């Protein structure tokens, strides 16, 4: 079991920022074993599950796709350690120098969003993922704000298109969205 959990954690780290595919966790693990290992990591609070939501309205938790989730580590320091990244290098260089900068930004924003939730809620995080023929789109986070869905797109730097954010807003009639870096 310990090796399975290590493999699941490693897979969560490598798949941060995208839909988690259980069968990518280790060729020797079955879907069931990989799912159980990620659930143990979630129960231990080492990882945070981000649930896929259709974004049709609020509450966001009433509109989830249980087969599509993302995971982030509980702490950016753990992520940096597991990726063998040195904080001194991160501070002294440009974010563009790191291939992991987008994933790191997504973890940081997700953890801050979770901390900002009402103390009386479970702090669940949501994202939007659309798979269509020859087209996939994803918005990193969805929040409930003033009785409406608020999409949040995370970018590592000042550049980057927001096609998915604009697509979601157009499809669902959402007036306000946030892009952060």
Show which residues each predicted segment covers.
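A cross-kingdom feature that marks ATP-driven nucleic-acid transaction machinery
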Residues: 39-181
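Conserved helicase/translocase motor-coupling segment
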Residues: 1-43
């Amino acid at each position: 079991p310990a090796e399975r959990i290590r493999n699941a954690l490693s897979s969560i780290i490598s798949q941060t920022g995208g839909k988690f595919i259980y069968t990518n966790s280790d060729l020797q693990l079955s879907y069931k074993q990989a799912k159980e290992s990620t659930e143990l990591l979630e129960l231990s609070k080492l990882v945070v599950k981000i649930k896929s939501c259709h974004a049709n309205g609020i509450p966001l938790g009433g509109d989830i796709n249980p087969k599509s989730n993302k995971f982030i580590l509980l702490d950016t320091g753990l992520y940096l350690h597991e990726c063998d990244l040195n904080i001194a290098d991160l501070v002294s260089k440009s974010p563009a120098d790191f291939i992991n900068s987008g994933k790191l930004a997504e973890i940081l924003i997700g953890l801050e969003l979770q901390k900002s939730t009402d103390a009386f809620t479970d702090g669940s995080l949501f994202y939007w993922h659309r798979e269509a023929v020859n087209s996939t789109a994803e918005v990193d986070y969805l929040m409930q704000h003033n009785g409406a869905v608020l999409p949040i797109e995370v970018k590592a730097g000042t550049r980057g298109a927001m096609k998915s954010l604009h697509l979601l807003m157009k499809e669902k009639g959402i007036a306000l969205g946030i892009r952060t870096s």
